[in-house]
Amino acid sequence: KFDKDVKAWAHFDKKVLLEKASEADEHRRSGKPVGPLHGVPVAIKDIFGTVDMPTECGTVIRKGKSYSQNAEVVDLLHAAGAIVMGKTTTSELAYLGPPKTTNPHDYSRTPGGSSSGSAASVASFMAPISLGSQTGGSVIRPASYCGVVGYKPTYGLISRNNILRTSYSLDHV
């Protein structure tokens, strides 16, 4: 309901999310080993390739299309037990024009970058953690505008495989 104003989500399926959460609960109850992020919901920017949900990259050209392989970082999240809860909005191709997302603290303002949906989803308490990408400020600016922490790791530390590329030498996850 809140997302009607913030518009943080490009893809969110509540039914699938609740099924994944139930499976995580059952896994924990079974006594099987769990990962360090077991059951933690994580949002991801809609340029991270996924096989089980659309990766539209903010453009109608990719409407409803998925990747044939997950982004490596998505596989790492799954291996750690995290639940990918959905895709957050981005500007078209993570580059063109402002995204439709609004700042959850003032709907008349923008979160300020292509990872706007990621920052807004955390700032509005819709997601505890969200992954974004940055070429020229797309993580740190929206995080700052939305009052949350944006972390930009060392270049190349996190694989960019199966993530829409804007600039090979500048893109960060």
Place the predicted regions along the sequence by residue.
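Gly/Ser-rich catalytic/binding loops embedded in alpha/beta enzyme cores
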Residues: K1-G136
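Fold-level recognition of mixed alpha/beta catalytic cores in primary-metabolism enzymes, strongest
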Residues: A119-V173
